[in-house]
């Protein structure tokens, strides 16, 4: 059962009373949409992978890489089966679903591939990103929240770097991925979280 309306009014009143006027104005502004724009897919991804961090065993242990192939994701110490046609786990918490859109679990997958992993790691990464692009329609849901975008873009760039030329040589995939990343970046630029006045 939800919170009574009188409690909601009090909650919002107390919250707004502590905010700076610029924060209130920024929060009241609607999400700004950006149109699709052409992007030069011949550009090579930036080299931002850091092996000491991205291939760290303790970092990788936070995720069950083998379960990803079954569409099961271990995030914040909880495993959920995800419907990749919707890219959400309805029974999971909002925080868990937010974490789903970070794609952090793909960094150790790409690191495993770079260390001599199998073609299945590459195919799984491609399947996850392509199903995400198909399911997460612009600009709806947690997928398009500025915070999830800011983390996902970095994680995708790290993965592209770790997978290397084998992805760059897949023109169709790189075209789709680069176009998606560019749109996410433009959306992030247009929808910065000015109402927070801080980094997360």
What are these regions (language model features)?
Residues 2-83:
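Extreme N-terminal leader/anchor segments
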Residues 1-5, 19, 23, 133, ...:
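Detector for methionine-enriched segments
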Residues 94-200:
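Aromatic-lined, polymer-binding surfaces characteristic
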Residues 84, 88:
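Active-site substrate-recognition loop segments, prototypically the cytochrome P450 B′-helix/B-C loop
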């Amino acid at each position: 059962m939800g919170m009574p309306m009188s409690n909601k009014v009090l909650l919002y009143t107390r919250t707004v009373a502590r905010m700076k006027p610029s924060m209130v104005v920024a929060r009241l502004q609607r999400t700004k949409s950006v149109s699709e724009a052409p992007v030069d897919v011949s550009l090579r991804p930036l080299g931002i992978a850091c092996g000491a961090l991205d291939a760290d065993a303790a970092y990788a242990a936070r995720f069950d890489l083998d379960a990803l192939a079954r569409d099961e994701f271990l995030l914040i110490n909880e495993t959920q089966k995800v419907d990749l046609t919707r890219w959400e786990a309805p029974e999971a918490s909002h925080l868990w679903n937010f974490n789903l859109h970070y794609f952090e679990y793909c960094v150790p997958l790409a690191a495993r591939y770079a260390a001599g992993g199998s073609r299945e790691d590459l195919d799984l990464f491609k399947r996850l990103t392509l199903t995400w692009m198909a399911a997460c329609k612009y600009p709806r849901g947690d997928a398009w929240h500025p915070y999830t975008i800011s983390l996902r873009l970095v994680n995708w760039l790290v993965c592209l770097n770790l997978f290397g030329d084998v992805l760059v040589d897949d023109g169709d995939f790189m075209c789709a991925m680069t176009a998606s990343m560019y749109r996410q970046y433009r959306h992030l630029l247009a929808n910065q979280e000015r109402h927070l006045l801080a980094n997360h």
